[in-house]
Regions:
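A short, active-site helix/loop in glycosyltransferases that binds the activated sugar's phosphate group
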Residues: 1-17, 22-26
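A structural motif in glycosyltransferase catalytic domains
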Residues: 51, 63-70, 83, 180, ...
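A conserved mid-protein helix/loop that constitutes part of the nucleotide-sugar donor-binding site
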Residues: 58-73, 90-96, 138
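Aromatic "clamp/platform" in nucleotide-sugar-dependent glycosyltransferases that forms part
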Residues: 113, 132
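Short acidic/histidine- and often glycine-rich active-site loop of Leloir-type glycosyltransferases
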Residues: 142, 155-166, 170-171
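Short hydrophobic beta-strand element within catalytic cores of glycosyltransferases
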Residues: 149-153
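Conserved acidic donor-binding segment of nucleotide-sugar-dependent glycosyltransferases
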Residues: 165-177, 186-191
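A short, well-ordered alpha-helix in the C-terminal region of glycosyltransferases
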Residues: 179, 186, 193-207, 215-219
């Protein structure tokens, strides 16, 4: 929204923006999939305490270096949660090397592609997104639909728009692993703050419901007639 206004300042007072709706019910339904159908290994993993990232394994754009460094800082501070990463890509070997260099092989697990990532999202303690840039960042919304706490880089474009007004998650500066770790600890251990975030997450979810989007379309059509 803000980027469009910057490109066309002379039209800023006339711009109306409408989000694409999300199929919230489908996301929730897949998140509630019966884990008893999983292999014993998958079931053991999903029943553990873990943070989750879902991303194409692109070491540059997705900035796995910051993600893995931030997680290493958290481990040094004593957290017990593991880090699972869902996705595949040509950066896998480079990312595996990053994990090895941090001696995190037992704690950072590359799960590959998953037919249903939402059930893994549902069971995670929080969702981390470390990209240097994004088109919009729909995966952040998908995490919110499952009432997950979200920690995201403040990258262009999307995260700020998704996680603010009201504040529905935490943002850290792109490439700042220390700040990433600080934000995770804040969300992980501040129970009062968790309640505040959950309240705001419910408000944010409504913005992307089909009924809400349809109402905005209806209003714009009426005003233009």
């Amino acid at each position: 929204n803000e980027e469009i206004k910057e490109l066309y300042p002379f039209l800023s007072h006339e711009i109306e923006y409408i989000y694409n709706p999300l199929d919230c019910n489908n996301i929730i339904e897949q998140g509630n999939e019966n884990i008893e159908k999983m292999t014993s290994y998958e079931k053991e993993l999903i029943e553990s305490d873990y943070f989750l990232a879902i991303s194409r394994l692109d070491a540059v754009q997705k900035d796995f270096e910051t993600l893995i460094e931030g997680y290493s800082i958290l481990k040094n501070k004593g957290i017990k949660e593991k880090l699972y990463i869902i996705g595949e890509g040509n950066g896998r070997v480079k990312i595996e090397k990053m994990i090895e260099e941090k001696n995190s092989g037992e704690d950072v697990i590359l799960l590959g592609e998953k037919k249903n990532p939402y059930v893994w999202m549902k069971y995670s303690k929080l969702f981390i997104h470390s990209s240097k840039y994004e088109g919009f960042g729909v995966v952040l919304l998908e995490a919110l639909m499952l009432d997950k706490f979200v920690i995201s880089s403040n990258c262009p474009t999307g995260p700020t728009e998704i996680l603010t007004n009201p504040k529905a998650g935490e943002l850290f500066d792109v490439g700042d692993a220390n700040q990433l770790a600080e934000k995770v600890l804040k969300v992980l251990y501040d129970k009062d703050y968790q309640k505040e975030l959950l309240k705001n997450i419910q408000l944010k979810k409504k913005e992307f419901e089909l009924s809400e989007i349809a109402e905005k379309f209806h209003k714009i059509i009426e005003e233009s007639m």
